[in-house]
UniProtKB/Swiss-Prot annotation:
The modification Phosphoserine is found at residues 189, 192. GO terms for biological process: cellular response to cytokine stimulus; granulocyte colony-stimulating factor signaling pathway; negative regulation of apoptotic process; positive regulation of granulocyte differentiation; positive regulation of phosphatidylinositol 3-kinase/protein kinase B signal transduction; positive regulation of transcription by RNA polymerase II; regulation of actin filament organization; regulation of actin filament polymerization. It comes from the Eukaryota. Residues 203-225 are annotated as: Involved in PLN binding. Its main location: mitochondrion. This is HCLS1-associated protein X-1. Ubiquitous. Up-regulated in oral cancers. Residues 210-279 are annotated as: Mediates interaction with UCP3. Residues 114-279 are annotated as: Involved in HCLS1 binding. Residues 16-65, 99-262 are annotated as: Disordered. Belongs to the HAX1 family. Recruits the Arp2/3 complex to the cell cortex and regulates reorganization of the cortical actin cytoskeleton via its interaction with KCNC3 and the Arp2/3 complex. Slows down the rate of inactivation of KCNC3 channels. Promotes GNA13-mediated cell migration. Involved in the clathrin-mediated endocytosis pathway. May be involved in internalization of ABC transporters such as ABCB11. May inhibit CASP9 and CASP3. Promotes cell survival. May regulate intracellular calcium pools.
């Protein structure tokens, strides 16, 4: 199978009736015949009688070229390339209609803020950011007007303690006190009956002690030592101790200097003098 047969089978054209290659079969002529054809201005192809000769049987799909009077060369063929090119042009022209939608898809985001959901005048930034504000104001993004929100009762905060991962160890490791409602209670009667223990939260206690020692030498030679102790409860204890410093009397002669060991006479005097003194 030739390359031309493979090409025609790929595009669905019927097979040839002969094994002659139409691309180059009609071009394998003598040089003299080519010159004669050029002089006569004829064309080589299906219109040429030599093309329909028994030596060159006609085929369903032919290929040829002709010389125009102006000196140009024009190729013509019956392989169906014109239809093929026309089909490709129609396909690529239709691709222009395969455009994206005119409106791009909108990404999910926060809804537009309405005037009723804006920060109300006089409301603190903390209340606007908290899910359950401390001042029991209605939620900003709830879509409820201020006049309607005033008549509603504040929603209690949910008990998130039971949903914590280590809520089973609260009795061993107490982390946060239990949530209590924010309301005014009369504590006078409760304190008079139960005392301050149940009312006040237990506070951790720490014990420490600070000790500072200061020594001062006065001009008369007395050394004063001041010791200050401060405990965790703020009690301060200061102890002052005075004693005289060790000093030699002023009228005493100069104390003898130790002999230098590098002097041989001094070493002999040291040993011999002691021996003679002991005698």
């Amino acid at each position: 199978m030739s390359l031309f047969d493979l090409f025609r089978g790929f595009f669905g054209f019927p097979g040839p009736r002969s094994h002659r290659d139409p691309f180059f079969g009609g071009m394998t002529r003598d040089e003299d015949d080519d010159e004669e054809e050029e002089e006569e201005g004829g064309s080589w192809g299906r219109g040429n009688p030599r093309f329909h000769s028994p030596q060159h049987p006609p085929e369903e799909f032919g290929f040829g070229f002709s010389f125009s009077p102006g000196g140009g060369i024009r190729f013509h063929d019956n392989f169906g390339f014109d239809d093929l090119v026309r089909d490709f042009n129609s396909i690529f022209s239709d691709m222009g209609a395969w455009t994206l939608p005119s409106h791009p898809p909108e990404l999910p985001g926060p809804e537009s803020e309405t005037p009723g959901e804006r920060l109300r005048e006089g409301q603190t930034l903390r209340d606007s950011m908290l899910k359950y504000p401390d001042s029991h104001q209605p939620r900003i993004f709830g879509g409820v007007l201020e006049s309607d929100a005033r008549s509603e009762s504040p929603q209690p905060a949910p008990d998130w303690g039971s949903q914590r991962p280590f809520h089973r160890f609260d009795d061993v490791w107490p982390m946060d006190p239990h949530p209590r409602t924010r309301e005014d209670n009369d504590l006078d009667s409760q304190v008079s009956q139960e005392g301050l223990g149940p009312v006040l939260q237990p506070q951790p206690k720490s014990y420490f002690k600070s000790i500072s020692v200061t020594k001062i030498t006065k001009p008369d030679g007395i050394v004063e030592e001041r010791r200050t102790v401060v405990d965790s409860e703020g009690r301060t204890e200061t102890t002052v101790t005075r004693h005289e410093a060790d000093s030699s009397p002023r009228g005493d002669p100069e104390s003898p200097r130790p002999p230098a060991l590098d002097d041989a006479f001094s070493i002999l005097d040291l040993f011999l003098g002691r021996w003679f003194r002991s005698r």
